[in-house]
């Protein structure tokens, strides 16, 4: 019997991963200003491969095949200028790259072999929503991939999700980004797979908080599954450390990806209003809001992850 096979495309690649609303777009814009880093790319279909694998809808073999095949084609399309985004206000637009001419040249170039050799060693950059939660699958499928995982305060993520209505019954829309499942005539996000009954009984606030605390727990478990070699291909970047100590973090990123940041990187920090203070003025108001709207048990779990997050920042709220 024949087996699925994809020849590995050995190209340096970096994925910026993290939960929705965790600072991935900002990180990708910063990376784009580094020496020899491609502009950001995103592909919903590649992401859905590991999303569906996470909830056991596709096998290991099929997921690995599709990830490899999809990555190869995405990289090829990027080289020839196919599907390049020129929408001015979009974070992934070629027009927002420091050298947009490079992408217009790709559109007109016919020398594909020259591009495939990648003599300038330009690192391909892409976004992965919740990618590290499938880190073992991704790193084993794509041996040249490194992952920068954006980690943000769970209070900020929960509040942001609620303001975006992610806990409401919005998942029947045909253009919804996240994978969706049908359960007893109800459409729920894939995050609720395995606890659909509980999800449907919850209010919108408890739904969001439980999803987020589940994601934090799942990411912790996934990191523990990685071998020591795989862990060296992963870098955690805490959002608040990045915005309060940017130059320290930029140097740490440089060491990880083996690329220097540039004067354009420093200019972008100014545009993004970095450095910033550790907490926004309304941080305590957000905590009070979440406490008021959620049930005590659910809120308590959220605060456990907030405490873990602050511990990583060496910050003690009680000081």
Model-derived regions: residue spans:
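Gly/lys/ser-thr-rich phosphate-binding loops in alpha/beta enzymes
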Residues: 2-53
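Short His-Asn-centered micro-motif
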Residues: 17-18, 125-130, 150-152, 239-240
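PAPS-dependent sulfation machinery
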Residues: 42-126, 180-197
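PAPS/PAP-binding and catalytic site of the sulfotransferase fold
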Residues: 23-36, 137-142, 162, 236-261
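Conserved phosphate-donor/acceptor-positioning beta-strand/loop module used by diverse small-molecule
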Residues: 127-128, 138-164
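Hydrophobic/aromatic beta-strand patches that form the interior of the parallel beta-sheet core
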Residues: 14, 38, 146-148, 235-237
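Conserved nucleotide-binding/hydrolysis micro-motifs of P-loop NTPases
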Residues: 45, 152-156, 242-243
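PAPS-dependent sulfotransferases, especially Golgi type II membrane carbohydrate sulfotransferases
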Residues: 1-15, 20, 185-236, 242-319
């Amino acid at each position: 019997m024949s087996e699925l096979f994809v020849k590995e495309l050995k190209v340096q690649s970096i994925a910026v991963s993290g939960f929705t609303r965790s600072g991935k777009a900002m990180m990708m814009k910063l990376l784009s200003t580094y020496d020899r880093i491609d502009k950001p790319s995103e592909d919903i279909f590649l992401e859905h491969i590991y999303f569906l694998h996470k909830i056991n809808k596709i096998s290991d073999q099929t997921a690995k095949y599709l990830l490899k095949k999809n990555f190869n084609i995405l990289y090829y399309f990027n080289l020839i200028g196919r599907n390049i985004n020129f929408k001015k206000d979009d974070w992934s637009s070629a027009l927002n790259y420091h050298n947009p001419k490079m992408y217009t040249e790709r559109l007109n170039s016919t020398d594909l072999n020259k591009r495939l050799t990648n003599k300038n060693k330009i690192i391909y950059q892409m976004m992965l929503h919740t990618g590290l939660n499938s880190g073992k699958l991704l790193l084993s499928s794509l041996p040249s991939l490194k992952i920068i995982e954006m980690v943000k305060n769970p209070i900020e993520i929960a509040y942001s999700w609620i303001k975006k209505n992610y806990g409401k019954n919005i998942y029947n829309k045909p253009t919804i980004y996240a994978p969706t499942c049908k359960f007893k005539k109800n459409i729920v996000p894939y995050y609720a797979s395995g606890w659909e009954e509980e999800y449907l009984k919850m209010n919108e606030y408890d739904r969001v908080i439980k999803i987020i605390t589940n994601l934090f727990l799942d990411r912790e478990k996934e990191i523990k599954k990685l071998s020591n070699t795989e862990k060296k291909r992963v870098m955690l970047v805490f959002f608040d450390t990045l915005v309060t100590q940017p130059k320290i973090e930029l140097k740490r990123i440089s060491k990880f990806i083996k690329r220097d940041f540039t004067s354009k990187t420093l200019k972008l920090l100014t545009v993004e209003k970095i450095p910033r203070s550790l907490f926004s003025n309304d941080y305590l108001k957000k905590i009070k809001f979440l406490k008021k709207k959620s049930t005590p048990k659910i809120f308590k779990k959220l605060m456990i992850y907030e405490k873990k997050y602050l511990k990583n920042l060496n910050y003690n709220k009680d000081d």
